[in-house]
């Protein structure tokens, strides 16, 4: 007997589906793209069952298409997420996530002594991997931080 499967989150006609987001990260991704302030319909699935991750988050954003730059920012939070662009209920494009080399004016430097807290300069981080851990190095104070420390702020 074939196992029946049913979508736990309704399909969208046009927009972006971000799947395989690690559990507990979906809300952060939503805020990263400022979707919590959007007038478009956003469907959020939190702690959904996943054979690969155990549990995962999922975002479906109607009538919004994520560009390559946004996808690279997403890679900081969910490097193995899948991003599908949907048109007329069909996947028309899959965006591959790649870590950006630099991230500018997105995160605040965790170092309270960094010049970015007192001067009108945009934050800037170099992004790299070390032993499969994502690290960010501040352009100004040159301190290196684990991704979680920078993205939690």
Swiss-Prot record:
Superkingdom of the organism of origin: Bacteria
Obligatory cofactor(s): Zn(2+)
GO biological process, any: pyrimidine nucleotide biosynthetic process
Molecular function terms, GO-annotated: metal ion binding
Binding-site list for Zn(2+): 109, 114, 138, 141
A GO cellular-component term linked to this record: aspartate carbamoyltransferase complex
Membership in a protein family: Belongs to the PyrI family.
Stated name of the protein: Aspartate carbamoyltransferase regulatory chain
């Amino acid at each position: 007997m074939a196992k029946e499967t049913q979508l736990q989150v309704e399909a969208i006609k046009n927009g972006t589906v971000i799947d395989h987001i690690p559990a507990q990260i979906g809300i952060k991704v939503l805020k990263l793209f400022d979707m919590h302030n959007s007038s478009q319909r956003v469907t959020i699935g939190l702690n959904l069952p996943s054979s690969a991750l155990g549990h995962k988050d999922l975002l479906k954003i109607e009538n919004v298409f994520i560009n390559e730059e946004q996808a690279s920012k997403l890679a900081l939070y969910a490097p193995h997420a899948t991003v599908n662009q949907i048109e007329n209920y069909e996947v028309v494009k899959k965006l591959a996530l790649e870590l950006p080399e630099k991230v500018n004016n997105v995160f605040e430097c965790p170092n309270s002594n960094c010049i970015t807290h007192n001067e009108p300069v945009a934050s800037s981080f170099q992004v790299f991997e070390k032993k499969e851990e994502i690290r960010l190095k501040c352009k100004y104070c040159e301190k290196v931080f684990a991704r979680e420390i920078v993205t939690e702020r």
